[in-house]
């Protein structure tokens, strides 16, 4: 695939001013015309987009809602790049979907991104949704944010209906991924990509002061406890993030949290983003939609 060589080159110069923002801007132009409703939402430090596929009722605090946290290694992508995925998710889940355009590294830290995601959740709560009506969902780095947000909410006694993670990056530590057999078969991520991400995440955290100290890096898989939302994970059988998916499922199950991993052979990382071209992506999103509907009654 063409993506892997680009990431390989970028991994040698992670701090160079690569135009990562262009990806989401270009995707906005490429979104096909449809009857899907997309409304801009303002959050305290970020923006969001409320997406409602044709036939889905407005977000009014009834039925269900999905809080979607996009992937992109914490440094790129947004509501536009994930437009088709989110549109189909809204359709199959029969639900409005709030996509948070959280702040990105390297200018901002992962902690700041998580704050923005929390603000998105609060926005849905203020709209009238109860925790048991809200599903947290995300792909790749968005899977990390979804799980970290679920843990933050657990600390204040709120448990969303479910958590859905697509090809999730759930562990910032790179060593186990780089040693995984799939590092040789992953069509997107060379081993050095995780070195580059590690450097960018660490430098962004060092610049963000929390109570007078640099932001600490948070590992969600080190904080798995009973009471987290039931979880569904979809992952490619050949991608290196299969490691994170299987480790998360094992830890969740050990804590008594219902967790299911569905492995898709022959697919690439985050193949659901290509839903306009891949029948398998549509099948995956249909299954996820059914899971969300069942979890929210």
Curated annotation (Swiss-Prot):
Thermal dependence of activity, per record: Optimum temperature is 40 degrees Celsius (with pNP-butyrate as substrate).
Other facts: Was identified as a drug target.
Family of the protein in this entry: Belongs to the 'GDXG' lipolytic enzyme family.
Single GO MF descriptor: acetylesterase activity
Activity regulation remarks: Inhibited by the ionic detergent SDS and by the serine protease inhibitor PMSF. Inhibited by the FDA approved drugs Diosmin, Acarbose and Ouabain. These drugs remain bound in the active site pocket and could be probable drug candidates to combat TB disease.
Domain of life: Bacteria
Disulfide bonds: none
Residues the record marks as active site: 140, 239, 269
EC number(s) from the headed UniProt entry: 3.1.1.-
GO cellular component, one term: extracellular region
Function: Esterase that shows preference for short chain fatty acids. Contributes to the growth of M.tuberculosis during the nutritive stress. Elicits strong humoral response in both extrapulmonary and relapsed cases of tuberculosis patients.
Keyword annotations from UniProtKB, A to Z: Hydrolase, Secreted
Protein's organism: Mycobacterium tuberculosis (strain ATCC 25618 / H37Rv)
Pfam families to which the protein is assigned, alphabetical: Abhydrolase_3
Name recorded for this polypeptide: Esterase LipU
InterPro entries reported in the protein's UniProt record: AB_hydrolase_3, AB_hydrolase_fold, GDXG_lipolytic_enzyme, Lipase_GDXG_put_SER_AS
